[in-house]
Amino acid sequence: MILEFLSQGPALLVKGRRNVLVVADLHLGIESDLDRHGIHFRSRTRERCERLETCIRETLPDLLLLLGDLKHAIPFPSRQEQREIPEFIAHLRSLVPLGIVPGNHDVAIEQFFEPGELLAKEGVIIDGTGYVHGHMYPDVSLAGMLIIAGHHHPMVSLRDEVGCSLRSPAYLFSLLNDGCIGFPVREGG
């Protein structure tokens, strides 16, 4: 298996028997939540869809795996989400088969997906790799595997001597061990 990080996503391509393009935490519809708090941005759903389409066309995956928090509003989809998500999903579905491991923001998400696309929120195994959103304990069947998770929104911030800074999404790697919440490295396979 080979992991290829795509900065234009940000996304991860897991190359194995099947190539799986993984994207987490899109939070479509966040703009309507911000608007309610006096912060006004236009919707960026179209731009997110275009970036994802670029990743799909460049990598030609066998599956697009949405790793949770496709939408933002809790507990019910906002009007913006009701309007934008069906079109977003239909467009992606026209390009590649897709699946979603629901995240903590994905309450009532099943209305947007076809049978077989909505996967277990406790995590799934695809070609020997575990996938979880990351907001709950992984299913015990994932013990001893490489686990790919979203949810945590890691960023790196670099500051120069003048005080200018650059912030960018980051990918974190870690072996699980007895000091971690999760599974010991050598347990389960």
Regions found by a protein language model. Give the residues of each.
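Conserved catalytic scaffold of divalent metal-dependent phosphoesterases
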Residues: 16, 23, 28-29, 54-59, ...
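N-terminal active-site segment of His-dependent metallophosphoesterases
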Residues: 1-83
